[in-house]
Amino acid sequence: MGDKMDMSLDDIIKLNRSQRTADRGRGRGRGVRGGSARGGAVGRVGGGRGGAAGVGVPMRSRPVLSRGGRNRPTPYSRPKQLPDKWQHDLFDSGFGTGAGMETGGKLLVSNLDFGVSDADIQELFAEFGSLKKAAVHYDRSGRSLGTADVHFERKADALKAMKQYNGVPLDGRSMNIQLVTSQIEAQRRPIQSQSRGGGVARPRGGAIGFAAGGNRRDRGANRGRGRGAGRNPKQQLSAEELDAQLDAYNARMDTS
């Protein structure tokens, strides 16, 4: 320290530069002895490329690599079991195959009270003959749809049950019983899907359904009026819209 006090500023700068170059040379030599030029604390923490200075690094980096890449697709094999969970609901809510209907009699019971359970249906129809299946239709949340399927081993037993219970009230609601055939099965599916959307006449929204019906009435009335069909464009107020657009355009031109 005493020597630097006697030296000039330029000499001190030159001395510092010479010391830095000497330290750099020593650092390179130590790196070669250790087996790596990029070892040290950086290699220990971040998993560097060092040799002897980063001996514990490969063991720490291996678990990180094993969690990604190859092992990631393994959890995606679990969704293959999801269809098995919904298989029971699909068979309960749907209808059987054609071969199953030919061997016995199948009844479709509708307009049921939502409190009627599977046990109630089985107890009600078991007195007419042996049953293959008697179950209420439920949605995925467990709520009753108000319909049920009753499978008899013999078609004659199904006809007896239909004649006996069709129109008879159960828990305050009259049962509607039909013998399921291929034609009834094909007709019931679109009716059920449309009834959930708010009716057959308006499956896609109320205003659109009424507009379509109104156009049909106008067409039938305009046939006897000759040129009455030309009045429909006036009801759309297209001229007023054009006038409004023209006024807006003129206003923009005036301001500019």
From Swiss-Prot:
Annotated PROSITE patterns: RRM
Biased composition (Polar residues): 186-195
Molecular functions per Gene Ontology: C5-methylcytidine-containing RNA reader activity; mRNA binding
Feature: compositional bias, Basic and acidic residues: 15-26
One of the protein's GO biological processes: RNA export from nucleus
The RRM domain, residue ranges: 105-182
Region (Disordered): 15-85, 186-256
CDD domains (alphabetical): RRM_THOC4
GO CC field: cytoplasm; nuclear speck; nucleus
SUPFAM superfamilies: RNA-binding domain, RBD (SSF54928)
Keywords: Chaperone, Cytoplasm, mRNA processing, mRNA splicing, mRNA transport, Nucleus, RNA-binding, Transport
Locations listed in the record: Nucleus; Nucleus speckle; Cytoplasm
Gly residues bias: start-end ranges: 32-54, 196-212
Domain of life: Eukaryota
Gene3D superfamilies registered for this protein in UniProt: 3.30.70.330
Quaternary data: Component of the transcription/export (TREX) complex; TREX seems to have a dynamic structure involving ATP-dependent remodeling.
Function field: Functions as an mRNA export adapter; component of the transcription/export (TREX) complex which is thought to couple mRNA transcription, processing and nuclear export, and specifically associates with spliced mRNA and not with unspliced pre-mRNA. TREX is recruited to spliced mRNAs by a transcription-independent mechanism, binds to mRNA upstream of the exon-junction complex (EJC) and is recruited in a splicing- and cap-dependent manner to a region near the 5' end of the mRNA where it functions in mRNA export to the cytoplasm via the TAP/NXF1 pathway.
Family: Belongs to the ALYREF family.
Protein name: THO complex subunit 4-B
Lineage, highest ranks first: Eukaryota, Metazoa, Chordata, Craniata, Vertebrata
